[in-house]
């Protein structure tokens, strides 16, 4: 179960790295990022950060264009996001999955880590 405890140093480092990458690729970063780490699962929830152009598209019922564009950008920055998580945690990332909720201006980055060696 994901915790709602205050962010740990690794969670904060990952949040900051993911926010920086989103700002670099999108031109505007999220207003809030929360990262939860639980075993092999790392979940980053990003709130806010839609550009004025994206807001306009959403307001004119073209949110699907925003979602497709965001997903493309998330795929483009995927290797760098994986590198950031691996660097902070010292563990390989097995998988990265991204999703967007345009209506609520939310994005999520889900990383699945390789199991720890015993």
Predicted segment positions?
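Interaction-mediating elements
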Residues: 1-118
